[in-house]
Amino acid sequence: MKSFIIFSGLIFVIFLSNKYSCQPVADNQYLSSLSENVKVLEQRMYPAMSASSANEEKRFQLEIFGSMAKAEEQRSRYPNPLFFHSWKDTED
């Protein structure tokens, strides 16, 4: 068992020291999150589908940010939703 662990560790070290596995890819950039890694992988695997999914994602983000902007606008109209009724009554 001990020799198996040493042997597998040796193979692992050889694999890590392999110059081809350590070479950076030309377009390798720092990716800050897993979702960006997934997007890059999908673009490389399915280039035709990634273009259409990018358009769908942009549309989805516009919908989300549009609804968030509307919600923020509504929030800015009223100081605190918990005290909305008492606040409205004091202005009348």
From Swiss-Prot:
Expressed by the venom gland. Residues 1-22 form the signal peptide. It is found in: Secreted. Its main location: secreted. GO terms for cellular component: extracellular region. The keyword Secreted applies. Coiled coil: none annotated. It comes from the Eukaryota. Belongs to the non-disulfide-bridged peptide (NDBP) superfamily. This is Venom protein 49.1.
